[in-house]
Every structure is written in C-alpha cells, then in structure tokens.
Amino acid sequence: MAKDNRRNLVSHPGEILKDEFLQPLGISVYALSAAMGVPRTRMNDIVLGRRGITADTAIRLGKFFGSEPQSWLNLQQRYDLIIAETEPYNTLSCVRTLKEVTDAGDFLA
C-alpha cells in the first residue's frame, strides 16, 4: 500500500475515542474529563486530534473504560508512526542503512 494511502486510512486516537466510545455511550468530553480528573481542554484537544494520548492519559482512559492502557498507547504509536512515515518533508532519505555504510567502508569502530 502506498504511504499516502496509509495516511488516509489511519485515524487519530481521539477520533476513535469519540466515535467508538464517547458517542455510543452518550458520554460528553466534559463528563469524561471530570471522571478522569483531567482538564477538559486536554480531552477536548485529544478528541479534536490536536493532542496525542500520553501514558498518563492512557492509564486514566484504561481505568475509566476498563481497558488496557497499552491499547490506547498502541493507537497513538501507530498513528504517530504512519504520520511520520508519510510526511512530505520526511528527511529519512538522508539516513543510510548499516549495509550502505559498511559496504562503503565508512563504518568506524
């Protein structure tokens, strides 16, 4: 799959939180924030895709929903990786592989 297509298929974890948890359960961002003991702006920014899910937020989401915190972090990590790989300004083309370095004799011990 082309990298640009991957970018179109990945959802921000906040969108998943909103579409698969909050809306079906009828929970507002305000109510979630209050129950989790975090500022409403934090959860609002996550739901709007302006902020990522941190370890602290993942633990709180896990406790609130009875889910594994790691699952929230995995969603964020997957999103971050795909976005980073598909950024048009990605500078990874300048990174040489270990094979390229050793074949060129540039590997310093």
Language-model features and meaning:
Residues 39, 50, 65, 76-79:
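The DNA-recognition helices of helix-turn-helix-type DNA-binding domains
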Residues 26-45:
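Short alpha-helical DNA-recognition segment
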Residues 18, 43-44, 69:
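Alpha-helical structural signal
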Residues 50-63:
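Short, basic-rich loop-to-helix N-cap that marks the start of a DNA-contacting helix
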Residues 2-27, 74:
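A short, Lys/Arg-rich alpha-helix, primarily the initiator
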